[in-house]
Amino acid sequence: MQEIGILENLQKSLALKEGMLSYEMLGKSLSYNPYLPRVIPQIKDCVFVTPDEVLGKFLEENTRTDCVIVNFKGLYEIGAPSVFDLEVLGLLRRHASSLIVHQDLFISHYQLLESLVQGSDGVILDEELLKEDLKGMVEFAWRLGLSVFVETHKPDYTHLKDLGVLGVLEKVPHSQQNQKKNSFFKLNFKLI
């Protein structure tokens, strides 16, 4: 039941954003974007933060890490997120040298384009959420120059490697509870 509410909030947020700035205009804004995605060669260590923790913990404490994963998924549990929530990615891009990976409930090309415009270097797509749309989303993200990771339950990653996915984030049972208790922790990706 909660998943239905989360998806409804996601769709409301997406409709609001697309109403304010069309897909075409968002695409045209790339010509003014100072932040091209950087190549993610190999990730040694990552810090996992929520948007609120970017200011509160990451930037104030001047944390040094190879990669920052900003997880926006929790925002949809509360309601439809603000159209300005992704601006934290641009703030992070301006003030930290770490690579930025955007984790969200990606369901459309608009969201991937928006992530690029805001300054992320890569995205984490949810295999379970996208199902048969995963291939198209991976291909579009690659065309934009974003590095692609996939969140999955499956122990075999062969099908993801064939799509050009850089790495996986394994879903671990009860990981949501751990994130809520302490969402500022080291996380290692499995590169494939």
Please identify what each model-predicted range represents.
Residues 83-86, 131, 135:
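Non-membrane alpha-helical structural segments and their capping/turn regions in soluble enzymes
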Residues 69-74, 114-134, 167-178, 191-192:
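Glycine-rich phosphate-binding active-site loops on the catalytic face of alpha/beta enzymes
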Residues 107-119, 154-166, 182-192:
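Catalytic cores of alpha/beta
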Residues 92, 96-98, 105-110, 117-118, ...:
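Eukaryote-skewed repeat-based solenoidal scaffolds used as protein-protein interaction platforms
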Residues 43, 97-100, 104, 124, ...:
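Short, Lys/Arg-enriched charge-dense amphipathic segments
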Residues 1-100, 109-110, 144-150, 154-166, ...:
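Conserved N-terminal beta1-alpha1 strand-loop-helix module at the mouth
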Residues 98, 136-151, 183-189:
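Short acidic, glycine/proline-enriched helix-loop-strand junctions
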Residues 78-81, 103-104, 126-127, 149-152, ...:
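Glycine- and other small-residue-rich loops at beta-strand/loop junctions that grip anionic moieties
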